[in-house]
């Protein structure tokens, strides 16, 4: 019997009966000179679906089993009995079957469909009664299916050649798969230049347009030490803005993991039906800078995009911080406590009385202050700061001249500066003030005492 090859249309191909996806058979029989015998209604029939990556081809049923590479695991197929009124043992049935298409073949009222999934080897075997079935790929599982297999019709048993029935039928529908792209991640300038600052990160990616709906979309912010995940401020896929915190939220967030809910997936899949090759993704999230932020090289913040269980290579963004150490000393290089400093962004010549300090009231303990400061987004960056003393230690004069310090990124981004104070000591003066008068009074009292003693001794002698 000649089987016609029909035109396959994407997302709903019309396939004539039995021009199957490279269908093979488990058993073969020796050639016979006569035509087809009557179908043995007592024989059990099976259908084995083999799902692999590749280009799909349709043609006459050849009855060959093949060993295929690249199995596709977890793909769901729905097998639906159709044209149940036909008796495959009659020639009239085969006249109807030869003209049947996937769309025209009516489902059976009193028989249910079977839903099956491919195993680790990409195959699934189904025991089915003799009859005609429509086979459709209905879910992708943990796969990104850019081209799904076309639906097809199969009879159990299946005619092979000119005179043979095959009761154990094997079909080889193929997929074209794709992979998630690598996302990018860019840091904005922090809200302030010291720990406690917040940094907004912009994550961008694109998700491919699939022929089957997305079953899961997850964005994972892999927050490093020194940063703490705070919140997601916005999320958008294609032209769809995703919302959170409502009764029907589009995504949930837990410890930096952003997971689309069924409502969010519905939005994405609806938008995908109108898209071409890919849809842009943009998520803005916020982290807080901790006191433990590293000052030895860049702090790298990674992000991954997981589509239907397939995780992308991580994308990453960086933020760089340095450490400014100030030693407060006197002329003898002795460390001084209780000096108070403020730090301003930029060079000192640009700092005015109206400038707001980055940090203030830094007081030396053990003669030292240490302050972590923002440098930039890359390890090649540097940033200028102005260090100003606002109160000198007791006994020392305030130094009003600021010091411009350039904090650079690097393996050791520590800048050390000595800030010297002069002790207040006036010159020696003649003792003409109260101190001199006191000395003269004391001398006079001594002379009076000596005179009184002399008079007393003289009177005793004359007595």
Model-derived regions, located:
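Solvent-exposed loop/turn and edge beta-strand elements of beta-rich ligand-binding domains
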Residues: 2-463
């Amino acid at each position: 019997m000649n089987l016609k090859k029909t035109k396959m249309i994407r997302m709903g191909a019309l396939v004539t009966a039995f021009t199957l996806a490279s269908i093979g058979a488990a058993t073969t029989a020796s050639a016979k000179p006569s035509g087809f015998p009557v179908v043995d209604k007592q024989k059990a029939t099976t259908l084995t679906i083999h799902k692999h990556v590749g280009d799909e081809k349709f043609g006459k049923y050849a009855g060959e089993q093949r060993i295929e590479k690249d199995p596709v695991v977890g793909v769901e197929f729905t097998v639906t009995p159709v044209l149940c009124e036909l008796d495959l043992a009659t020639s009239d049935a085969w006249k109807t079957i030869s003209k049947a298409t996937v769309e025209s073949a009516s489902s059976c009222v009193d028989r249910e469909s079977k839903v099956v999934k491919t195993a680790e080897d990409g195959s699934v075997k189904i025991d089915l009664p003799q009859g005609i079935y429509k086979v459709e790929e209905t879910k992708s599982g943990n796969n990104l299916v850019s081209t799904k297999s076309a639906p097809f019709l199969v009879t159990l048993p299946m005619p092979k050649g000119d005179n043979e029935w095959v009761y154990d039928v094997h079909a080889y529908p193929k997929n074209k798969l794709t992979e998630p792209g690598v996302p990018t991640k860019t840091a904005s300038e922090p809200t302030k230049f010291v720990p406690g600052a917040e940094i907004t990160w912009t994550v961008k990616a694109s998700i491919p347009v699939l022929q089957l709906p997305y079953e899961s979309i997850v964005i994972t912010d892999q927050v490093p030490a020194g940063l703490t995940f705070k919140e997601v401020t916005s999320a958008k896929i294609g032209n769809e803005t995703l919302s959170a915190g409502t009764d029907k939220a589009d995504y949930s967030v837990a410890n930096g993991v952003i997971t689309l809910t069924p409502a969010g997936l519905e939005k994405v899949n609806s938008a995908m039906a109108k898209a071409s090759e890919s849809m842009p993704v943009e998520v803005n999230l916020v982290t807080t800078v901790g006191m433990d932020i590293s000052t030895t090289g860049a702090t790298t913040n990674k992000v991954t995009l997981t589509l239907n269980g397939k995780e992308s290579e991580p994308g990453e963004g960086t933020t760089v911080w340095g450490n400014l150490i100030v030693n407060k000393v006197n002329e003898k290089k002795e460390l001084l406590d209780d000096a108070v400093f403020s730090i301003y962004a930029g060079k000192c010549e640009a700092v005015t009385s109206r400038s707001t300090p980055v940090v203030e009231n830094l007081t030396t303990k053990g003669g030292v202050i240490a302050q972590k400061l923002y440098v930039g987004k890359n390890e090649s960056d540097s940033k200028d700061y102005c260090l100003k003393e606002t109160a000198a230690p007791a006994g020392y004069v305030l130094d009003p001249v600021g010091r411009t310090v350039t904090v650079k990124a690097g393996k050791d981004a520590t800048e050390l500066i000595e800030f010297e104070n002069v002790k207040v000591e006036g010159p020696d003066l003649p003792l003409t003030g109260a101190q001199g008068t006191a000395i003269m009074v004391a001398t006079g009292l001594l002379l009076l005492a000596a005179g009184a003693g002399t008079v007393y001794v003289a009177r005793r002698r004359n007595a």
